[in-house]
Regions:
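A short, Lys/Arg-enriched amphipathic alpha-helix followed by its capping loop at the start of a domain
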Residues: 31-41, 268-271, 465-467, 484-496
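Non-catalytic pre-domain segments flanking phosphatase-related domains
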Residues: 414, 418, 422-469, 487, ...
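Mg2+-dependent phosphoryl-transfer enzymes with acidic/Ser/Thr/Gly-rich catalytic loops
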Residues: 619, 626-711
Length: 711
């Protein structure tokens, strides 16, 4: 398992110490222990960051820590030695990938499964999975796209939150992880449908809800008439400590929405009269030396307490110990109080389960995991976290009926036992992983690669067939047949993905497609196969870019070709990072063999593609339309027989050869006559899109009959 940020150890978890040490740390430590106790699991290694910093315990500098039977923490150094927040780790993750490869290859041994937690570990897990061919399981915990939107909704400026949280990189990593993961474990249905559902690469069939468990030996109702635990360090803040206690326990993070909770309490006289408010939001010493985010949260809470003169009604202790938490829940239960979680978004809500196991009813945000928890446990109410009046109303309602409060208390204890125990979690998890190993292990090992690929949209991944066509004089040229082809594609979605392969640059390709009313393709192979982009967002395939880059010396090639007869560079808008394009005079141009010799003599390597007796493109040796399509087939795991490709000119030759289903449209250039007679190249009589449709009918492409006979 990979969980990289925060302070991770097997005892005395410092939950709430900072924004990175929260529920995820509890989750991964307890999951590792629970899996280690299972006879179905040989060993569990929880890999995290080794931290050497006098400000934190030396426990976090120990390379190995045993957690229990067959489970341990492995700490790997990467990035700064000191403890830093997770947003500062992104630039060091590639180093961790290399160190993990060394660690797994030399001393630890290869695991059967990788399980990454959060986006940073997802990035590392994705690279390891690609390189080693090991299936990847991923748990998101908190999703960048969801958090970003919530902060915007709360009034934060986009530029400011991008600087603070680096959302672009985080979201890109999450998309990439979704592409690679064999299984996504979520805590709630809402997490899959509304949160992961906002990502392009979610494959719902690979997402599974397995609610986390809790250690029920730690969290239980108060026993009989014993004195309440922790009363003294809370009661010193309160004038009437015997009143019902509204407990909020969380990290000091803006998304936890504590300021709005205090506003709701402060502005409702009835609620203030009925109950006390207890805020346990991490630990603080000198605010001047706190982390900026924590300082802002703590300062705002102190300001609001003072602004509304809540002294004697609100307890806001500076410090608490991990062992105090269970006693806090029992104290609130003993005083017929409530646990409140006002977070803007709560991916799961582990503290809600801890409270429920302690017999404490809950009132929580309606956004995220609390919906499932309250539905399963039937022990409280939900509210709109953006509406202070709704928060206050829900709290008053929950306190208004003693009989219902007692029923909620009993329901919560029972519900946790039925739905949130670790043994049940491990059983479901183990079954899911066994299915992944059976289904995907061989396929993943065939796809071992050392490059870090670009994200593929789910639309492409889920397609069983792909139609790829040139643009000029192939797809475009006749509006009537184009309309018929587009309708054919619409009716066959999502089984058939649509792509273009063109000599045009990406902007030029999008412009001409827009002029003809063609919807944006799922795949765009542009600049004669030197660039690949995917989906509506036009994500670039960086793996392809890295693959074609070796031996490409663009400036040197341009210098070597400068001034040669019969070659005139095309305008800058038609050039590309990996493409030099020329208009040619066939009568004066050197033969291609002579041009290649000219370049090789200068230590230069390039692919030369001549088309229509008018153009010459100079490309990296690893690039072409045909190679780009084969790269895609490799990434998708689709046989080339599932690709129908159509073209009309010389730069289409490579993609028309081989096992693809080739279609040459009726208005093709004479240079394609060399392909006549080949088994899988069909020469259509119809022109433009009509020729593509004719080829589709010829092959029975994407028809039920074709699906039965095509391997």
């Amino acid at each position: 398992m990979l969980s990289l940020h925060g302070l991770v150890r097997g005892h005395d978890l410092e939950l709430g110490r900072d924004a990175d040490t929260g529920g995820q740390v509890t989750y991964v430590v307890e999951l590792a222990r629970a899996l280690g106790r299972s006879p179905a699991v040989e060993r569990v290694d929880l890999l995290t960051r080794l931290v050497e910093d006098p400000r934190v315990s030396s426990d976090y500098a120990r390379p190995v820590e045993e957690l229990g039977p067959r489970a341990r923490i492995l700490r790997v150094p990467f990035g700064p030695r000191r403890y830093v927040r997770k947003e500062h780790l992104w630039g060091h993750l590639d180093h961790l990938v290399d160190r993990c490869l060394s660690l797994l290859g030399e001393s630890v041994g290869l695991p059967h499964v990788l399980h990454s937690h959060y986006a940073d570990a997802g990035y590392v897990g994705t690279q390891l999975s690609r390189i080693l061919g090991i299936p990847l399981v991923h748990t998101g915990h908190s999703l960048g796209r969801v958090k970003r939107q919530r902060l915007l909704d709360a009034g934060r400026r986009e530029a400011a939150i991008e600087r603070q949280f680096n959302f672009r990189r985080r979201i890109a990593a999450e998309e990439e992880t979704l592409e690679q993961a064999s299984l996504v474990v979520a805590s709630t249905v809402e997490e899959i449908e509304r949160q992961w559902g906002s990502y392009e690469n979610l494959r719902p069939r690979r997402a599974l809800v397995i609610p986390p468990g809790i250690d029920t030996s730690r969290f239980s109702p108060p026993a009989g008439s014993n004195a309440p635990e922790g009363a003294e360090w809370i009661d010193r803040f309160l004038r009437e400590p015997g009143k019902p206690m509204i407990l909020a326990l969380c990290r000091p993070a803006p998304k936890k929405n504590l300021a709005r909770l205090v506003e709701a309490y402060a502005t409702d006289a009835e609620l203030r009269e009925r109950a006390n408010l207890v805020l346990v939001a991490g630990n603080r010493d000198d605010l001047r030396t706190s982390e900026p985010e924590e300082r802002r949260v703590h300062s705002e809470l102190l300001y609001l307490i003072d602004k509304y003169d809540l002294y004697g009604k609100v307890a806001f202790p500076k410090q608490h110990r991990p062992e105090d938490v269970a006693g806090l829940y029992r104290l609130a239960t003993g005083r017929r109080g409530l646990f409140v979680n006002p977070a803007l978004n709560e991916p799961f809500g582990l503290t809600l389960i801890e409270a429920a196991a302690s017999g404490l009813p809950v009132v929580a945000t309606r956004d995220g995991g609390p919906r499932d928890i309250v539905a399963n446990c039937r022990n409280g109410l939900l509210f709109d976290p953006l509406d202070p009046k709704a928060i206050a109303a829900a709290l008053k309602d929950a306190l208004s009926d003693g009989r219902r409060w007692r029923q909620w208390s009993r329901n919560g204890i029972k519900g946790v036992r039925e739905h949130y125990g670790w043994p049940a979690h491990v059983e479901r998890y183990s079954k899911a992983v066994r299915r992944v190993l059976h289904r995907e292990r061989k396929r993943l090992r065939r796809h071992v690669t050392s490059v870090r690929g670009a994200t593929l949209p789910a639309r492409l991944i889920e397609a069983g067939h792909v139609l790829v066509t040139d643009i000029d004089d192939t797809l475009l040229g006749d509006r009537e047949s184009l309309h018929e082809l587009l309708e054919w594609l619409r009716l066959r979605a999502p089984d058939v993905a649509f792509g273009i392969a063109t000599g045009r640059t990406l902007p030029m390709a999008l412009a001409i497609l827009g002029e003809w009313g063609v919807p944006r393709p799922d795949l765009l192979v542009t600049s004669v196969g030197t660039e690949i982009h995917y989906g509506p967002s036009r994500m670039r395939d960086l793996a392809w870019t890295r693959h074609i880059r070796p031996l490409w010396r663009r400036a040197s090639l341009a210098d070597a070709l400068s001034g040669l007869p019969g070659m005139t560079p095309q305008p800058a808008m038609k050039q590309g990072e990996f493409k030099l394009s020329y208009d040619i005079d066939p009568a004066r141009l050197w033969p291609l063999e002579r041009l290649q010799g000219h370049l090789r003599a200068r230590g230069l390597h390039a692919r030369l593609i001549r088309s229509q007796d008018r153009f010459l493109d100079v490309l990296p040796v690893r690039a072409s339309k045909g190679l780009a399509i084969r790269h895609l087939a490799y990434r998708l795991g689709l046989p080339l027989e599932r690709f129908l490709v159509a073209g009309d000119s010389g730069n289409d030759v490579e993609m028309l050869l081989g096992d693809t289903l080739g279609v040459v449209v009726g208005n093709h250039k004479p240079e394609l006559k060399v392909l006549e007679g080949l088994d899988r190249v069909y020469f259509a009589r119809a022109s433009f899109a009509g020729g593509i449709l004719e080829g589709i009918r010829h092959y029975g492409f994407a028809s039920p009959v074709a699906a039965e006979v095509t391997p």
